[in-house]
C-alpha cells in the first residue's frame, strides 16, 4: 500500500494497493488521505488500519489519520507531540516509534502507544537528524542510517549509522557508510540462499541540494559494501520488505517523480535488481509505503 507524497505537480492524496507477487492482480484503491502529506510516517494498527502521521504541509505536521478500508471509512487522530516531516519510523508491538525529522532537524523521538493515543516513551537520538532511515534488524536491535543534521543547527549530510538496543535502551555507533546520503531508502530482508539478514541502503542525495545517487550499499554484518547500482540516480523513494527481497517504489529521478518498481534480491551475498511489471498508478516521491494483509482490499485477477 502506498499513500500521500508529491506527484508531478501536486500533492498526492490517493491510496494505492499493489500486489507484489502477481502483476495480473489489480486491487481497488483504499480511501484518499484527508490531509496533504509529503514526508509523512505510518504503520499498520492491529493488522487492520493504516495509520499516517505528520508530513508537510498536513496542517500542523502533528496530526494523524487512519485510512479506512474500501468502504471509505476514515478516522482522524492527533497523536504526535511534535511537528514532524522527513522523519523515520518503525512499528513495535502496536507502538509507532517516530524519530527525528526536518523540523529542526530534530534530536527527539517519540514512541506512541496506539491503544491509548499517548506517548509511552521518548528516546533522545544521538544527533539532530532528518531525511534518514530507521530499520529493525533483529527483535532487539534497530539501525539509524544517514540523513541530514549533526549538531545543533547543523545541516550536514551524514555517513554515520547508529545502533539502538531495546535491552540497554541506548545508542552505540555503527559502521560508517561509504557514501554520506540523505533521502535514501532502506530495507531489511533475508538472503535467498544463505538466509542471512541483508540490510540495504539505496540511492538518495549526498548534498543539501539535489546531487542524486545511484549507489547501493549492503551491510555484511561488519561493514558496508557497495551493491548493484540503480539504473538511474534516485532519491525520496520507498522500500518495503518481503521475506527474501526488498521492493523499491517511486522516487525522484532529478526531473520528475517516477512510478517504476524494482525488486532487490541477494543470493550467496551477491545482490541484483529486477525491474517489476507492476507500477504505481500515480508517480510519487516522499510517500508512505507499507505491507498490508489481503483482507483489507478487494483484488481481482485480470489475466
Residue ranges: model-predicted function:
Residues 1-303:
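Kelch-like beta-propeller repeat domains
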